[in-house]
């Protein structure tokens, strides 16, 4: 066999190549080729499944994005409607407050007018009462004065004449 190796090596046939770089390169090409040949189906299937999973996830994400966009637009519409309703309520509240304020002012003016009328009525009544009291006092004073002077001025003839005239006045009535 020793004779065979030198002959084959000298003839360019099979032999042992001791050049480390050439042999590693050849071995590496052989290993990569074998791995490619055997793992092509396994890695290809795994990568295909991964690609399908990623595509499915992307489609799901797009669906969720569309759904979220639709829900966002609905929420924005509802927010806009709620803001409009809140503005309407605020304006109604302001109008109601203004109406209440105006009504309060009107009632205050009416109450003040009523107080003024009551004060004038009280003043008029008090004036009438005082006038009546002064008349009574004047009449009583005049009667007292007349009664005080009457006995001195009336004698029995004048007294009889006064009584007769008073009786005749009463009969006419």
Swiss-Prot record:
One family name in Pfam for this protein: ATP-synt_B
Transmembrane spans: 25-45
InterPro entries, A to Z: ATP_synth_b/b'su_bac/chlpt (IPR002146)
Keyword entries, A-Z: ATP synthesis, CF(0), Hydrogen ion transport, Ion transport, Membrane, Thylakoid, Transmembrane, Transmembrane helix, Transport
Listed GO MF terms: proton-transporting ATP synthase activity, rotational mechanism
GO cellular component: plasma membrane-derived thylakoid membrane; proton-transporting ATP synthase complex
Disulfide bonds: none
Membrane-topology annotation of the record: Single-pass membrane protein
Main subcellular location of this protein, as a coarse class: membrane
Localization terms from the record: Cellular thylakoid membrane
Domain of life, per lineage: Bacteria
Quaternary structure and interacting proteins, as annotated: F-type ATPases have 2 components, F(1) - the catalytic core - and F(0) - the membrane proton channel. F(1) has five subunits: alpha(3), beta(3), gamma(1), delta(1), epsilon(1). F(0) has four main subunits: a(1), b(1), b'(1) and c(10-14). The alpha and beta chains form an alternating ring which encloses part of the gamma chain. F(1) is attached to F(0) by a central stalk formed by the gamma and epsilon chains, while a peripheral stalk is formed by the delta, b and b' chains.
Function: F(1)F(0) ATP synthase produces ATP from ADP in the presence of a proton or sodium gradient. F-type ATPases consist of two structural domains, F(1) containing the extramembraneous catalytic core and F(0) containing the membrane proton channel, linked together by a central stalk and a peripheral stalk. During catalysis, ATP synthesis in the catalytic domain of F(1) is coupled via a rotary mechanism of the central stalk subunits to proton translocation. Component of the F(0) channel, it forms part of the peripheral stalk, linking F(1) to F(0).
UniProt record similarity statement: Belongs to the ATPase B chain family.
HAMAP family for the chain: ATP_synth_b_bprime
Designated name of the protein: ATP synthase subunit b
Species of the source: Synechococcus sp. (strain CC9311)
Lineage: Bacteria, Bacillati, Cyanobacteriota, Cyanophyceae, Synechococcales
